[in-house]
Design a protein with these regions (language model features):
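Conserved nucleotide-sugar donor-binding catalytic segment
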Residues: 148-244
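A conserved acidic beta->alpha catalytic loop
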Residues: 49-58, 78, 102
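Glycine-rich, basic loop-to-helix element that forms the pyrophosphate-binding segment
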Residues: 76-93
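N-proximal low-complexity "stem/linker" segments adjacent to membrane-targeting elements
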Residues: 1-33
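Catalytic core of nucleotide-sugar-dependent glycosyltransferases
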Residues: 160, 203-204, 227-235, 240-270, ...
Length: 347
């Protein structure tokens, strides 16, 4: 269901697209931070609500009645998950440029849109621009981290080499969707060309993949070294699971998703080995801390279900060898003993 007024602004240059689900506590602050942007150009705010049942829809309707000239609502009949919610909302947006904002984040400055759009308007070779942000603890309000610097090959190259940098995490932090603005036409072309990534979102959580791959293949990334957005850190989120095993499987899903991307784009065996070697080292470190080496080995071996060839089998053999996992097992046991002793001493 789409709720929009006939008074909705005509020909917006940029659309702020907000994806939300059961975030009634935060959504008004998010929406208002977008509606109150001070811009010399027309803009709209499009909210995609993914089947909320916590009173969020009623709140959004009241806001839409008050700000009918700028606010458009899209209510999904059922929960579609984050990626498909964004795809649907962006398709309904009318702006040349799309700025995305998660339902619990918000803009810190009134000219965030002006700064983001200015980069795209004046740099045709840039497909996506993102800015700095700070993360804060939702319970205490304490600022946890301030990020106003971004270094990556993605600033200078496009195409396969840019995607390689993306998949290898070749940057100091992942581009934050809530501080990003990009060209709508490139995104929609990517949704057709790389539709497999949308389908994979039903299996692996990684809503930024279809966006970042599409943008990296078509242009360079831009960056604004200023705090534009506040990123809220919650106790529970899509990344939060009841057990450490569930959490590890979730994290390892990103490794599998990267392999799917590499296969889809016909990466060379050397590129695939580079991606997997880097990401598996990260997962091994996670497994050590959580004492989940057996699960790590099982997940690494499951990569054959995606692609079974000489390269993958070599990667599996090298990353599950005794020389790799034995030191990890020992460290994992030491971490567990240390954690146990801490609990005993607290009592």
């Amino acid at each position: 269901m789409i709720i929009a007024s006939s008074q909705l602004v005509a020909n917006p240059l940029v659309s702020v697209v907000i994806a939300t689900y059961n975030q009634v506590k935060y959504i008004e602050q998010t929406v208002m931070s977008a509606l109150t942007q001070q811009c010399p150009f027309p803009f709209e705010v499009v909210v995609g609500d993914d089947g909320s049942n916590d009173g969020e829809r009623e709140l959004l309707k009241r806001l839409q009645e008050k700000y009918s000239e700028k606010l458009k609502l899209i209510f999904n009949d059922k929960n579609m998950m984050v990626t498909r919610n964004y795809v649907t909302a962006i398709h309904e947006a009318r702006g040349k440029y799309i700025a995305t904002l998660d339902g619990d984040d918000y803009y810190l400055v009134k000219d965030a849109l002006v700064k983001l759009v200015d980069v795209l308007e004046n740099n045709e070779d840039i497909s996506l621009v993102h800015g700095g942000f700070h993360s804060f603890d939702n319970k205490t309000g304490k600022v946890l981290n301030i990020s106003t610097k971004w270094e990556s090959p993605m600033l200078y190259v496009k195409g396969i080499n840019s995607v390689l940098a993306l998949l290898c995490n070749d940057f100091n932090n992942y581009p934050l969707g809530s501080s990003s603005c990009f060209r709508k036409n490139i995104y929609e072309e990517g949704c057709i060309k790389y539709k497999k990534l949308i389908d994979l979102s039903d299996k692996y959580i990684g809503e930024g993949t279809i966006l970042n791959v599409s943008m990296a293949m078509s242009g360079k990334f831009g960056y604004i070294p200023e705090e534009l957005t506040a990123y809220r850190v919650l106790d529970s989120s899509l990344c939060h699971y009841k057990s450490k095993e569930e959490s590890f499987r979730y994290s390892f899903g990103y490794v599998k998703l990267r392999l799917h991307v590499a296969e889809m784009l016909d990466f060379t065996p050397t590129m695939i080995k580079t991606i997997l070697s880097k990401t598996l080292k990260q997962e091994l470190n996670r497994a050590k801390v959580s004492n989940l080496i057996n699960l790590y080995i099982k997940e690494v071996k499951s990569l054959k279900e995606i692609k079974n060839d000489v390269v993958i089998n070599t990667v599996i053999r090298e990353n599950t060898s005794l020389s790799v996992v034995l030191p990890a097992r020992i460290l994992g046991c030491l971490y567990s003993i240390k954690s146990f002793l801490k609990k005993i001493l607290k009592k």
